[in-house]
Amino acid sequence: MRKSYEVGISPKINLCNSVEVLTNSFGTVISGRQV
């Protein structure tokens, strides 16, 4: 039970982290172009 729960939640955490990193990178590029 616990193992399947961890397997199910890990991809969501990884996805959130990936989106956050992409958003930060995208924001840096945008601010860099504006300046």
Swiss-Prot record:
Native organism: Escherichia coli (strain K12)
Gene designation per UniProt: ybgU
Origin superkingdom: Bacteria
One Pfam assignment: YbgU
Induction of synthesis: Expressed in both exponential and stationary phase; expression is higher during stationary phase (at protein level).
Official protein name in the record: Protein YbgU
Additional information: This gene overlaps ybgV on the same strand in another reading frame.
